[in-house]
Amino acid sequence: PAEYEIPARHSLPIPFKRIPRYVETFTADFVLEPRKESSDHHTLIVQGDPQIKDFFWDNSAEAYRDVVIPDIIKTRKSIATPCYGIELGDVIYNELTVYPVYLHNTDRVNMVTFNVIGNHDHDQTTLLKDSLGTMHYEMHLGPTCYSANIGRVHYIFIDDILYDRKDAKESYRHG
């Protein structure tokens, strides 16, 4: 609900509870903290396609750490309203081991950041079945489809990449 803080661990919103497989019943309790200030007027800092590769590969991780993140921090400090981030996908560039690099640097901003999955965030080795390609993303960043209320706005974050295909030579169909 909009009048409560968005539960987060560092920069990562945690608006969900994982449901264990093979259980007949499951209870998820959420602790809601009232907001200290209204979020009716808020600011979104939006970025897309950082496509981070591992350090020393193409300098994308270094550029994200040394240029992009300091710029976001500077921008964030100059804004008086509550700030939230939205990452529009392709957080990494096909390297599943780089999610911790992204998270470590995003945590430095001190701002809840909502993530949307991109085609390069999918596990490229499992692309014949779309549902298999999101496992690593979900382990690090959470669900691929979710929503959040900030102020009077309801934000919806949707995985619009459909990777089911007949063979590995085909590209993804939508997104």
Task: Give names to the regions the model predicted.
Residues 8, 96-175:
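Extended active-site neighborhood of metal-dependent phosphoesterases/phosphodiesterases
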Residues 5-99:
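N-terminal active-site segment of His-dependent metallophosphoesterases
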